From Swiss-Prot:
<feature type="repeat" description="A-1">
    <location>
        <begin position="89"/>
        <end position="99"/>
    </location>
</feature>
<feature type="region of interest" description="2 X repeats, type A">
    <location>
        <begin position="89"/>
        <end position="135"/>
    </location>
</feature>
<feature type="compositionally biased region" description="Polar residues">
    <location>
        <begin position="342"/>
        <end position="362"/>
    </location>
</feature>
<feature type="propeptide" description="Removed by sortase">
    <location>
        <begin position="360"/>
        <end position="389"/>
    </location>
</feature>
<feature type="region of interest" description="Disordered">
    <location>
        <begin position="236"/>
        <end position="271"/>
    </location>
</feature>
<dbReference type="InterPro" id="IPR003345">
    <property type="entry name" value="M_repeat"/>
</dbReference>
<keyword id="KW-0843">Virulence</keyword>
<keyword id="KW-0175">Coiled coil</keyword>
<feature type="compositionally biased region" description="Basic and acidic residues">
    <location>
        <begin position="236"/>
        <end position="246"/>
    </location>
</feature>
<dbReference type="InterPro" id="IPR049895">
    <property type="entry name" value="SMDRR"/>
</dbReference>
<feature type="repeat" description="C 1">
    <location>
        <begin position="154"/>
        <end position="188"/>
    </location>
</feature>
<dbReference type="GO" id="GO:0006909">
    <property type="term" value="P:phagocytosis"/>
</dbReference>
<feature type="compositionally biased region" description="Basic and acidic residues">
    <location>
        <begin position="93"/>
        <end position="147"/>
    </location>
</feature>
<dbReference type="Pfam" id="PF04650">
    <property type="entry name" value="YSIRK_signal"/>
</dbReference>
<dbReference type="InterPro" id="IPR005877">
    <property type="entry name" value="YSIRK_signal_dom"/>
</dbReference>
<feature type="region of interest" description="Disordered">
    <location>
        <begin position="93"/>
        <end position="182"/>
    </location>
</feature>
<comment type="similarity">
    <text>Belongs to the M protein family.</text>
</comment>
Length: 389
């Protein structure tokens, strides 16, 4: 900055010197022509030249000032460049110093890594020894578990045979029940009854209608119980499926257990479907009895005969079934403790006794003698009311 001020002062001094020279020249010219009046025109020319000279001096002074300004700027830039060069040299020194430090650190790191590698190698050798010991121990454990699973598999085979025998027995009972139902339906179409009995059972019919509603409600509750048992069996089926993945060695035995669980689930679903169909049949028959007042006298007599015959046949057939089921339960009691879990759940569900609120019976809650009696009584009551009206 001081250098720039000095250059500006130098330029002003030169400008003043040039201006003074021009002034002297003008004075000389003016003195030469002062006494010559005839040369006024020439004096004007000189003045014009002086003016031109002054303008030229001003231009030169401005150009000189611009040049000095440029020189000052270049000098400043040169100083900046010198400073940057100094900074770069300092950075170069720092980089060389850092490079040396990095080399020292790299050598130290290499030595540390070599030491760690040696330690790691020793540790791997020790780990290899431990691994061999663990493998021998694992082999012994696998052999032991295999023997245990083999024993469990044999036990499951025995339980499966017992369960299969129980399932076949229940299937025979179910088939016998279905045959009995078909026989009742065939006998119902052929039997006849008396119309006068409707008047004698009027009071029974009044109470029986309410009993029918309670029996229907009990049937619905039984349906819910079957659905709950189905859900429990489904959960148990899922549990058996998850336990199947515990050991590859016991895969075959667990697969058989899973298949047995699926069969039990299908059986429960079939029982539920049958219960639903019977419940719908009861509701349909009840609805037909409600609409019985629209029948003719002949149709009323036929319907009354059918209902009474059905009630009688059902009572006899279901009494026989109750005796057979009691005998079957007595024969199956010693094997109850060894049955597998899936069949135990199904047996408990099928053997569970239920008491109807109207009669206190413990027979099949979906199609009982009491329910048939109620339906017959309700039909008779509807016919009698039609006659009285």
């Amino acid at each position: 900055m001081a250098r720039k001020d000095t250059n500006k002062q130098y330029s002003l001094r030169k400008l003043k010197t040039g201006t003074a020279s021009v002034a002297v020249a003008v004075a000389v010219l003016g003195a030469g022509f002062a006494n010559q009046t005839e040369v006024k025109a020439a004096e004007k020319k000189v003045e014009a030249k002086v003016e031109v000279a002054e303008n030229n001096v001003s231009s030169v002074a401005r150009r000189e000032k611009e040049l000095y300004d440029q020189i000052a700027d270049l000098t400043d830039k040169n100083g900046e460049y010198l400073e940057r060069i100094g900074e770069l040299e300092e950075r170069q020194k720092n980089l060389e110093k850092l490079e040396h430090q990095s080399q020292v650190a790299a050598d130290k790191h290499y030595q540390e890594q070599a030491k760690k590698h040696q330690e790691y190698k020793q540790e791997q050798e020790e780990r290899q020894k431990n691994q061999e010991q663990l493998e021998r121990k694992y082999q012994r454990e696998v052999e032991k578990r295999y023997q245990e699973q083999l024993q469990k598999q044999q036990q499951l085979e025995t339980e499966k045979q017992i369960s299969e025998a129980s399932r076949k027995s229940l299937s025979r009972d179910l088939e016998a029940s279905r045959e009995a139902k078909k026989k009742v339906e065939a006998d119902l179409a052929a039997l006849t009854a008396e119309h006068q009995k409707l008047k004698e059972e009027k009071q029974i019919s009044d109470a029986s209608r309410q009993g029918l509603s309670r029996d229907l409600e009990a049937s619905r509750e039984a349906k819910k119980k079957v659905e709950a048992d189905l859900a429990a069996l489904t959960a148990e089926h899922q549990k058996l499926k998850e336990e199947k993945q515990i050991s590859d060695a016991s895969r075959q035995g667990l697969s058989r257990d899973l298949e047995a669980s699926r069969e039990a689930k299908k059986k429960v679903e079939a029982d539920l479907a049958e219960a639903n169909s019977k419940l719908q049949a009861l509701e349909k028959l009840n609805k037909e009895l409600e609409e019985g007042k629209k029948l003719s006298e002949k149709e009323k007599a036929e319907l009354q005969a059918r209902l009474e015959a059905e009630a009688k046949a059902l009572k006899e057939q279901l009494a026989k079934q109750a005796e057979e089921l009691a005998k079957l339960k007595g024969n199956q009691t010693p094997n109850a403790k060894v049955a597998p879990q899936a069949n135990r759940s199904r047996s408990a569900m099928t053997q569970q006794k239920r008491t109807l609120p109207s009669t206190g019976e413990t027979a099949n809650p979906f199609f009982t003698a009491a329910a048939a009696t109620v339906m017959v009584s309700a039909g008779m009551l509807a016919l009698k009311r039609k006659e009285e009206n």
